[in-house]
Amino acid sequence: MKNIILLIILISLSSCSGYKPILTSKDINFNILDIKVNENDRISNNIKKKLKIYSDQEQKENTISLEINSVKQVYAIAKDSKGDDSVYEMKVITNIEIINLDTDNNKVKFEEKFSFNNQSNKFELEQYKKDIQNDLIDKIVEKLILNLRTTK
């Protein structure tokens, strides 16, 4: 019985040997020349910071510039019996214009949202909102990178 379980584990582990991560920087076929954001837009500035590693690439076949505009919305979607807000939803909408030097410009829109419960401690609630915002920004950056890798 132990030999059969060991054999199953070995077979399953050996079948996973072809794993290759999607977001490796080795297979990047684009170079970000310039990223324009509004100075007052914190979300766009965070996205710009996360994309900096793609602007330091050696000369690639596809050189692009980006214009990023982002909006964050937080609104109540449910109330408790007293009429106080109990559930919130945070939505981050990012409009990105991809300016390709070789081809036409392309506009893409990414929208991510997350629902969360209200907390009695307002400081913890604000920290939680910041964490959620960073997670949503990470998802948007991930989608943008996949979009840029597939666009030629």
What does each model-identified segment do?
Residues 17-20:
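Bacterial signal peptide processing site
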Residues 39-53:
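Short extracytoplasmic
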Residues 23:
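Cys/His-rich zinc-coordinating "finger/knuckle" motifs
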Residues 12-15:
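C-terminal motif of bacterial Sec signal peptides marking the signal peptidase cleavage site
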Residues 1-10:
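Sec-dependent signal peptide recognition
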Residues 49-54, 58-63, 67-134, 138, ...:
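Surface-exposed short loop/turn segments
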Residues 147-152:
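Amphipathic, coiled-coil-like alpha-helical scaffolding segments used for oligomerization/assembly
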Residues 26-43:
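Post-signal peptide N-terminal segment of mature Sec-exported envelope proteins
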